[in-house]
A protein has these predicted regions:
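Substrate-binding cleft/loops of secretory-pathway carbohydrate-active enzymes
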Residues: 220-225
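Mature N-terminal, pre-catalytic/accessory segment of carbohydrate-active enzymes
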Residues: 1-23
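Alpha-helix-loop-beta-strand connector modules within alpha/beta enzyme cores
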Residues: 95-99, 194-213
Length: 225
């Protein structure tokens, strides 16, 4: 287990200005502003928030059951119409490289779990013969977004799925991952920590990825009783 960071990360998250619809030009424009105006005060993280894999995403209203950009191994990839440099399998690496060249760090947002689209198509998982349908927990749902099912951490292939995700992110040069919908799930309101086993797999996958990444957990709407 890696150490906790010494102080809260200082940076910018695209949700605050663009909701789910940020583009490559907007992301890099804000990175340039941070480099020129904020870096000297300790700001360093440029984070691309939710649904970078959704071609039609706009604002803060989600398109239910949208067609998502995904590779053959059930992993979401950037929408090329919004992030042109991600074409031909490049992923976020070109953007991360540009942000790193500014002396800054690059982060992404992900939703807990595996894409429902992958489950419906029963696509492969890298490093195992298990498929998406084998590891999905179809009663573990986010109440406000339809992109994902939870992962059944007891199933063969669950660990390999999360490992493959974070090895992909490491190859892109990701420094920070915000994982959302991490508190109670729709069918477990009585259990505010129903996603805790997925947190454990995510943390372990980061440690095995070969790259240091800050893990930031976002609960989503959660009861405080």
């Amino acid at each position: 287990m890696k150490d906790f960071i010494k102080k809260p990360p200082m940076g910018w998250n695209s949700w605050d200005c663009y909701g789910a619809g940020v583009t490559e030009d907007e992301l890099l424009g804000n990175a340039e502003f941070m480099r020129d105006r904020l870096k000297q005060y300790g700001y360093q993280y440029v984070v691309c928030d939710i649904q970078w894999y959704e071609p039609a995403a706009k604002g803060n209203v989600y398109n239910n059951f949208a067609d998502l950009c995904m590779d053959e191994y059930s992993r979401l990839i950037p929408a090329v119409n919004r992030f042109p440099s991600s074409a031909n399998g490049a992923g976020f690496k070109p953007i991360a490289d540009k942000i790193h060249s500014m002396g800054l760090k690059f982060g992404i947002h992900i939703m807990r779990g595996i894409p429902r689209q992958a489950v419906h198509r029963n696509t492969r998982i890298y490093g195992t013969t298990a498929r998406a349908r084998d590891i999905a927990s179809q009663f573990s749902l986010c109440p406000w977004n339809t992109d994902m099912y939870g992962v059944d951490t007891e199933k063969r292939g669950a660990e390999e799925y999360y490992d493959s995700l974070f090895k992909l992110y490491a190859s892109w040069g990701v420094d920070f991952v915000k994982v959302d919908d991490i508190a109670n799930t729709e069918f477990s309101p009585q259990n505010p920590y129903s996603a805790e086993k997925e947190i454990e797999l995510i943390r372990a996958a980061i440690d095995r990825s070969g790259r240091d990444m800050v893990l930031s957990l976002s609960p989503g709407p959660a009861p405080l009783n």
